[in-house]
């Protein structure tokens, strides 16, 4: 059985879609958003950056948002409620709680062992490896849906997960497959 205690995962980015359930006047919104850009000829929304929490928000007149760059779900919530408080100052009315949906979480990690990627690519199903184009194996997990980039050093990037639990489950599935096909060496006891 694969030992998961050596595996480390760290959140690098979370992307969420948000519905504030109210229309916004972007001409007014741009006035209250520091560190923001609005050029409706190029893009139909405001690009706004917060330093605390450190995130970027795409704000649309429909009251829909995209929040990216967060390192935690709590950061997403703090950014949304910070924006709501700013919007109230320009007369925006809110009749219900915002709907926040996590769309993607990106994790970096280390499995704690090295891999021969040529062997992995030959034996492991659901993977791609084009070393001339990219130095890692691309492994696709169907359930939970995620993509894991596996590098020869044992470093990984997991994207597409909607929760930390999904990311861990995807990594477990990869490790089980690697073990099943004999691509993980059992550590010898001395």
Curated annotation (Swiss-Prot):
A GO biological process held by the record: DNA-templated transcription initiation
Molecular function per GO: DNA binding; DNA-binding transcription factor activity; general transcription initiation factor activity
The Sequence repeat ranges on this chain: 11-87, 102-178
InterPro entries: TBP (IPR000814), TBP_archaea (IPR033711), TBP_CS (IPR030491), TBP_dom_sf (IPR012295)
CDD domains: TBP_archaea
Pfam families according to UniProt: TBP
SUPFAM superfamilies the UniProt entry points to: TATA-box binding protein-like
Top-level taxon of the source organism: Archaea
Disulfide cysteine pairs (residue numbers): none
UniProt keyword terms in alphabetical order: DNA-binding, Repeat, Transcription, Transcription regulation
Role, per record: General factor that plays a role in the activation of archaeal genes transcribed by RNA polymerase. Binds specifically to the TATA box promoter element which lies close to the position of transcription initiation.
Family: Belongs to the TBP family.
NCBIfam families in the cross-refs: PRK00394.1-2, PRK00394.1-3
Descriptive protein name: TATA-box-binding protein
Organism placement in taxonomy: Archaea, Methanobacteriati, Methanobacteriota, Thermococci, Thermococcales
């Amino acid at each position: 059985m694969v030992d998961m205690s050596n595996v480390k995962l760290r959140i690098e980015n979370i992307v969420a879609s948000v519905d504030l359930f109210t229309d916004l006047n972007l001409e007014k919104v741009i006035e209250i958003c520091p560190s923001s850009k609005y050029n409706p000829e190029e893009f139909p929304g405001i690009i706004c950056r917060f330093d605390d929490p450190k995130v970027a928000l795409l704000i649309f007149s429909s009251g829909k948002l995209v929040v990216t760059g967060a390192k935690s779900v709590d950061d997403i919530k703090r950014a949304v409620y910070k924006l709501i408080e700013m919007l109230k100052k320009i007369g925006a009315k809110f009749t219900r709680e915002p709907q926040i949906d996590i769309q993607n979480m990106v994790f970096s990690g280390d499995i704690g062992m090295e891999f021969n990627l040529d062997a992995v690519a030959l034996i492991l199903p659901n993977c791609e490896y084009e070393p001339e184009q990219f130095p890692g194996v691309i492994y696709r997990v169907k359930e939970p849906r995620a993509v894991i980039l596996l590098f020869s050093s044992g470093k990984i990037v997991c994207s597409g997960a909607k929760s930390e639990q999904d990311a861990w489950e995807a990594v477990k599935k990869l490790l089980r497959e690697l073990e099943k096909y004999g691509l993980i060496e059992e550590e010898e006891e001395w």
